[in-house]
Amino acid sequence: MGLIWGLFSVIIASVAQLSLGFAASHLPPMTHLWDFIAALLAFGLDARILLLGLLGYLLSVFCWYKTLHKLALSKAYALLSMSYVLVWIASMVLPGWEGTFSLKALLGVACIMSGLMLIFLPTTKQRY
């Protein structure tokens, strides 16, 4: 069950990251503080997406807490790297994100996935 909570946490955190990225690219920069605050107070689509991203992170932390009760930290922590993979793929697939494909990034994703497979492979107990 810990693995399932961990996967929920990763998926929710990835969606939250994409939401925050969308909001950050559409809201005024925080260097223009009054414009930023005015946009938040207007509670338009961008501000609502920012709020959803923040709430998503909060929900992800709850799932992560449940994960740590059921799964060893060494395995649970490795799951977090899947978020990089999901956000990278989503940025290339979703319209308007303009994510770029590169062999270097693909190699990095392959390394992450290989590492996860090594960590989560079932171990066989040797009999002597």
From Swiss-Prot:
Residues 1-2, 57-76, 122-128 are cytoplasmic. Coiled coil: none annotated. Its main location: membrane. Pathway: Bacterial outer membrane biogenesis; lipopolysaccharide biosynthesis. It is found in: Cell inner membrane. Heterodimer of ArnE and ArnF. Belongs to the ArnF family. This is Probable 4-amino-4-deoxy-L-arabinose-phosphoundecaprenol flippase subunit ArnF. It comes from Escherichia coli O139:H28 (strain E24377A / ETEC).
